[in-house]
UniProtKB/Swiss-Prot annotation:
Its main location: cytoplasm. Specifically methylates the N7 position of a guanine in 16S rRNA. Signal peptide: none annotated. NCBIfam families: rsmG_gidB (TIGR00138). GO terms for cellular component: cytosol. Pfam families: GidB. S-adenosyl-L-methionine binds at G85, F90, D108, S109, T110, A136, E137, R155. This is Ribosomal RNA small subunit methyltransferase G. GO terms for molecular function: rRNA (guanine-N7-)-methyltransferase activity. It is found in: Cytoplasm. It comes from Nostoc sp. (strain PCC 7120 / SAG 25.82 / UTEX 2576).
Amino acid sequence: MTNLLPEMAEIWQQTLNWQPTDSQQARFQQLYELILEGNRQLNLTRITEPQEFWEKHLWDSLRGVAPQQQLISSLQLGASVIDIGTGAGFPGVPVAIIASNSTITLVDSTRKKITFIDTILSELALTNAKTLVSRAEEIGQQPQHREQYDVALIRAVGTASPCAEYTLPLLKLGGLAVIYRGTWTEEETTSVENAAQQLGGTVELIDNFTTPLTNSVRHCLYLRKVAKTPANFPRAVGVPSQKPI
Ligand SMILES: C[S@@+](CC[C@H](N)C(=O)[O-])C[C@H]1O[C@@H](n2cnc3c(N)ncnc32)[C@H](O)[C@@H]1O
């Protein structure tokens, strides 16, 4: 099995001012192997080469939580985190590996993806993560999930406005949504500012960076929950993406 680049330690250090411990590195390696194995039966990800996996899945997942010192501290101390549309477990599983004091809820609407993640969690003995088959629009209206989380992560689930509608209702006051995006435009800034404001949020930071191996453009948006989300949000299943705020 291809070794998942232990020589990346220096790049972790240079870019995130952090390095995985040996046991975290071993779990990253095991995660990579399990995903390659799972890909034989399920179409989980087209990213399978070790360098690409490292950069686009591991590094990218962790880069999203790295720039905010307050966020890192809260993950280290123990935060309640939800990852919406986690797919094969990104960014939630790498975050669960590095933030062992936090609880990570991994949500996806596709049962077969969640069944696969259940296997990953059990193989990696990741007891701080749990799974849920559901849609963001549904759990956003359920009292056991609405306004219950400190951090909501969302990567590659849609444009920023629906992502704001999926995540902000789930956050406690003061909580933070991290929306992982590729390219970004000024028009998107205007539309997400408007969406966030209607949902009780504010745009705290739009972080623009490139990935360390292929210089690919990335953006992460950080939305802070500053007021209660009005009861009519999130709207019914499908509406946030079909009729963005
Ligand atoms: C392109 S994949 C991204 C997976 C992962 N976040 C990543 O970055 O590799 C989008 C995932 O979001 C899930 N999804 C889409 N809309 C959703 C919703 N409203 N609620 C929950 N999951 C959703 C899909 O089932 C799919 O697994």
